């Protein structure tokens, strides 16, 4: 079973969580499915209104805990990661803007994260990083400088470490 934490208008989970039902400047994504920026919770399968830092689920419930572009908005990203690990049986997947791209994407991002932050946080809560990827966008070349790539998005995949 998959849970999507911070699902917004594009839920992918069997269970989908978001804190904001009303319109919010934090929301992005495909809003063509709705008349306004409110979440249409009737169209979202198994919708639960909850804070990503305090998820109302038992431990070890979901096979995959997924979150896309939510962790940069929460006040305590470490607590969010810890909660995602708590409710996960095994795998956690997080996507977010890279710290160097974050200010260009939305000024409402309260966290500017990078892979090193995720690696340190994972170690503290006994998660193992099994995949890390930074996608980039390229600037338009100027006649005097070559094409430059800038980090844009991080995708991290973790598994719970086996307890000894």
Residue locations for each model-derived region?
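Conserved SAM-binding loop
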Residues: 1-100, 156-160
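S-adenosyl-L-methionine-dependent methyltransferase catalytic module, highlighting the catalytic core
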Residues: 38-43, 47, 75-164
